[in-house]
Amino acid sequence: MTESLDPQIPSSWHPNGKLLAFTQVRPDTGNDLMVLPIDGDEASGWRPGKPSVFLSTPFNELEPMFSPDGRWIAYYSNETGTFEVYVRPFPGPGGRWKISIDGGSYPVWSRARHEIVYQDPEHQLMVVSYTADGDSFTPDKPRTWSEHRLLVRPGFRSFDLHPDGERIALAIAPEGDRVVTQDKLVFMVNFFDELRRLAPGSPR
């Protein structure tokens, strides 16, 4: 779909199916966020267009994820010296909102609720509720979803939300000093019911 000597890592499709967000590793600016337009259809064939830069800074930005309505992109960046999760309007320009506290990576939007799930530096899942009004994005304070720690593989996300927002699959790290000999995938049902049980005061 693209021709580049720079490494490119796809992350998410826009809901309209015609835009692909990806990370490109450049020698001068590091990891940048890019968008690839794609025209055509199944009958006539798909035709990739020219990639455009969504965000390029002297810092590293990674994992651009389109919101379910296509109006926002969540990603993580080390502009503060620590990787944090941010949200920007798409296609921009506009503001920038940091939704994580004390570090974060691998944001995933819930398709069923105004929630973003991400991984914190302690390899735990965090959940952020948000409201979006026009060009304004207001995140709530992050809250811990579970005391379980994810089994982390560098460069890979170890969890994902089901489209119904009720189930989550994740790889859990072994307890204590046990050595991992075989990875296990855990499938969580009624994800947000469990979240409300652990934090009764959390919004519905």
Task: Map each language-model feature to its residues.
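Blade-level signature of beta-propeller repeat domains, shared across WD40, Kelch, NHL, RCC1
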Residues: 158, 162-203
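Generic "edge-of-domain/loop-turn" microfeature
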Residues: 18, 27, 40-43, 71, ...
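Conserved beta-propeller blade repeats
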Residues: 5-23, 53-76, 97-117, 151-167
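Alpha-helical structural motif
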Residues: 8, 29, 121, 141, ...
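Hydrophobic alpha-helical membrane-insertion signals
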Residues: 109-114, 119-142, 161-179
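Multi-bladed beta-propeller domains
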Residues: 1-7, 37-62, 88-105, 130-153, ...
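A structure-centric signal for secondary-structure junctions around beta-strands
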Residues: 17, 30-32, 48-51, 82, ...
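A flexible loop/linker signature enriched in serine peptidases of the S9 family
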Residues: 1-8, 23-45, 56-62, 76-86, ...
